[in-house]
Amino acid sequence: SSTQNLSTSPILRRQNRIRTIYSSLAIEQNTLSLEQVTAVLSGKRVLAPPKDIAEVKNAYEIYDHLAELNPYSMDDLLLAHRTMMQGLVREAGEFRSGPVGVVDNKGNVLHFGTLPQYVPSLMEELIQWTESSSLPILIKSCVFHYEFEVIHPFSDGNGRIGRLWHTLLLSKWNPVFAWLPVESIIQDHQAEYYAAINQSNAQGEGTVFIEFMLGIIKEALTEAINEQPVAQSKEEVRWMKIAAFLRTNYIIQNVDVQNLLNVSPATASRVLHTLTKEGKLAKVRNGRYWAYKLA
């Protein structure tokens, strides 16, 4: 299926990861373009405010370690904030010590976050509820995202951590969600994102926001399904089959390649010669015959 292509294609995954980081930061007024974000993450020099560059590097670091995070660990949540906000805010990796107003992307105050003295216990409660509730994870993750934004536990970085944690919760249910560009779809519907938070606040419960986020997730899935996988050349497919064979066998011989790829002895010989020249295989003596192993 196309979502499997997303899980297995490193090119698609990298593209979506970069889009995710670009979008999550653009929502927070980061000025870098998608091309500049790509350049920063490729180690190139980019002329831009140092703060914006640091935000990109920090975000990439935490998204890169997504698989290692436990969504039900307070320590991991604080670690994620510390990584995301290191060098950017004084209280990186700590719950805020002062009051905070929750603002939209235009600077309008939507509501005021929970009083700081109640933040740790409310966050503990929210994490425990998310872990123990029997609601489907699709719903629970949206509830967590909404309640997290209401509490607004940090002095800064709440939006990007809330979206990161939503992705993390979903990715533990199905790994494909680690690579879905949910943040990009939110960026496309930014005004509605804040309106949904606003409406839910006015109603005193998160139904509007939950329905909005379910729509966003559906749109991200639809986009992934419609996304054409990057076509692989015949050579790449052959190399993948040989590499897979060599993960369970120490060496491969001409006859193995014939059977594996359904080719003639001459073609098998040519394939092995090319892969050796490319530095992927190394030629070794195997009794009276030549064989090949991973270089």
Locate predicted features:
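FIC/Doc superfamily catalytic core
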Residues: 1-295
